[in-house]
Amino acid sequence: MSTAAAARPVAGTGLREKTAASLVNSFRLASVTQRLRYHIQDGAKVDPKEFQICCISFAKGIDFAIANNDIPKKVEEFPWLLKQLCRHGTDVYTKTALMVLMISVKHACHLGWFSDSESQELIALADEIRTCFGSSGSTSPGIKSPGSTFSQIMERFYPFVKLGHVLVSFEVKAGYTMLAHDFYISKNMPHSLQEKIRLFVAQTDNIDTSACISNPPEVSFLLNGKGVEKRVNIAMDTGPQLPTNVTAQLKYGTNLLQVMGNFKGNYIIIIAFTGLVVPPEKPVLKDYLQSGVIEASPDSDIIEGPSRVSLSCPISRKRIKLPVKGQLCKHLQCFDFSNYVHINMRNPTWRCPHCNQPVCYPDIRLDQNMAKILKDVEHNAADVIIDAGGTWKVTKNTGETPEPVREIIHDLEDPMSLLNSGPVVFDLTGDDDAELEVFGDNKVEDRKPCMSDAQGQSNNNNTNKHPSNDDYSSIFDISDVIALDPEILSALGNTAPQPHQASNTGTGQQYSNLSQIPMSIDPMPVPVPFSQTPSPRDRPATTSTVFTIPNPSPQYSQVHASPVTPTGTYLGRTTSPRWNQTYQSQAPPMTTPYTSRKVSVPVTSQSPANVSSFVQSQHVPRVLSQPNNYGVRGLTSSHASTSRQHPSGPTVQSVSRLSDLVDVDLTVPDTSNWRPRMRGSLVPGSHSTALDHMIIRPSQQSQTSTRLNSSQPVQTPSVQTSQAQSPFTTAAYRTETVLGNRNHPVPAPPGIVRPTGPTS
């Protein structure tokens, strides 16, 4: 049993694998040739597609035999069949299939498959068909000879690439060219497993610099129908290139190299087996000699001083082991040999890293002076200072790592302040009103200074002015026609502030008991009659007064205004519900002989009769100038009355007290639930309340207007007040007085749209 088991043949061992593959290939060639004989018979119905497939299969069988160094059976029948097949190339696709077949046959002829006469005839047929698809190029024999151009290129730019068996080599002249060069690869070719097949492309016109090993910018290379990496026009590396590894694109048997494009010089193209050589650690190099030394002229004004030279390689920033430089380099700085070689084995630019001079491998020189310095100095030395005479000394090295600093350092700025400072955090959630309370609760309006303001400043050089900034009279183009009594202004300016309101020091203003009550300006403007002929010398009027109804008649309506003491009743209104209440502060009234004086203010305007006006006055006139007071924010009218007359024009009667018009709430505000908010925002639930303060609901007009006698007094009009509490308690009080009649609605001025809705 054991003997029989041992004698039983194992599968695959009866015939060698190579012999089995050759036998299968022989059967394939026999079947393909039989089918092709049928297509060349007279009167046979030829299928072009089947004919082309049979030609490609015939070529593959020949290639397999060439790759395995095998000669198939009945090879003597091939020449006659091939000659007959070449006569049937009528269309382009059939010629392409025949070209592939004849390329394989040509290599079979070189291997001695056929007789010499038959081989010559078949090679001639192959060249004739190939000319339809491009020339083959001129061969370049003797590329391995020491004096050849390609040998010099290899020595200069590929010193560690070992050239093996050359598969194809040819030269290309300048101009547009389409080449199709075929070559075959046999398994019996001498090569090692470590060797790779690489493609070399080099220009032979100028080989002094690495530009000669760059790919032609307008030329593409294809192997077996596939583009070579970085050597086709769609993806090309325009710089110096290493030999391209094309092993994966080739196969045993016949291969085809196609080159097409415009050559701008003479090139050599080679495909060969190559290997790599490890660079030596201690190469044999020539010594560096300073070339082009110019003697110092006695008349020269340029004196060469000492130079600082780094002992680190500019490539790796590490200590130089073997100091080298280019033959034509003029500088003292060296670089390391090993670093320079390894970086050019990856990217063969071959230029000095310090001066960018071309330095190919034969031009590398060893600097003996720097080698001696490196041997004598300590290991931690970084730089040396070399004099013009050749003497050198080591610079002091503290061993400390320099701290990074900014490139730009401004004057009077600490360079380390930015590094030592922590992160800068900006608070974007704060309330802008809290910041504005220190300087007043008013919006600052940028305006171009007018001539009247400049004259006002020159007339009051000895007075410390603090004009109010929330001046909105210019929005409605109201002329400053109010003339105040100078004696009243002087009395107000000389009035001392109350102790609990403000105190003045020699260095500036100091304020105490500042209540943090934000003041929000009404978002909707109050309609005000526009003057049709404003004066060019108008400036903002900051006086809170009661204007008369526009009178078309030439007579003037009188408005009497009396000064208001800094401490008294003041009213305000805001759009927020928690501040929508009336505040009052009581203080002893200021006694002055001018308290009972009335200022007659003429106001003129042109508008139709039976028209009421809405006036919003919130500011203090610029002529009020107290030395240590931030100004009276408004003058409250003490007497006002109105009467309606014929279209000739109504008159306004004075009102004795402000309390006759407005009910004042003396309750103290509760600020316990106060919280900051954005300017102009509305808290939930306050929208309707804010609109109630701003919307003026018109009443239905009567069918016939009632004529009133000029002597008959008119009903007291509805009055709306708004409170504006300044952070400075010395400020006067600002009121808004709106005159109107429910039976006679007031038409809106130009540019103001009257709200519509149900009437009350």
Curated annotation (Swiss-Prot):
Pathway: Protein modification; protein sumoylation. The keyword Metal-binding applies. GO terms for molecular function: identical protein binding; ligase activity; protein homodimerization activity; SUMO transferase activity; zinc ion binding. Changing H331A: Abolished SUMO ligase activity but normal ability to regulate transcriptional gene silencing (TGS). It is found in: Nucleus. InterPro entries: Znf_MIZ (IPR004181), Znf_RING/FYVE/PHD (IPR013083). Its main location: nucleus. Residues 143-301 are annotated as: Interacting domain (IND), required for interaction with MOM1 and PIAL1. GO terms for biological process: positive regulation of sulfur metabolic process; protein sumoylation; regulation of gene silencing by regulatory ncRNA; response to abscisic acid; response to osmotic stress; response to salt stress. This is E4 SUMO-protein ligase PIAL2. The lineage of its organism: Eukaryota, Viridiplantae, Streptophyta, Embryophyta, Tracheophyta. The gene is PIAL2.
